[in-house]
Regions:
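Phosphate- and other anionic-substrate recognition elements at nucleic-acid/protein interfaces
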Residues: 1-81
Length: 81
């Protein structure tokens, strides 16, 4: 099954929401805004993650780079869409 991840990034915490192809919420959790903490959530189960989206902004560039370097299918989304 395919899974999709949304990240709502703030200075101290990031909300992580994982849904399946049907849109059913599989997991919601808040973690520290660090690549290590976010990667831990995304890799603790062997999920076939199709896409990870986070809003483009001042807090997203370094996080996007870290997730992409880890081989995850991450994209930046334009604010307001």
């Amino acid at each position: 099954m395919q899974y999709y991840v949304g990240l709502d990034v703030s200075v101290k915490e990031t909300s992580v929401c994982i849904i399946d192809k049907a849109g059913k919420v599989i997991r919601e959790v808040k973690v520290a805004t660090t690549p290590v903490a976010i990667l831990a959530v995304l890799t603790e189960e062997a999920l076939a993650i199709e896409r990870i989206g986070l809003e483009a902004g001042p807090l997203s560039q370094w996080l996007y780079s870290a997730l992409a370097e880890a081989g995850l299918p991450v994209i930046l989304l334009r604010p307001g869409i």
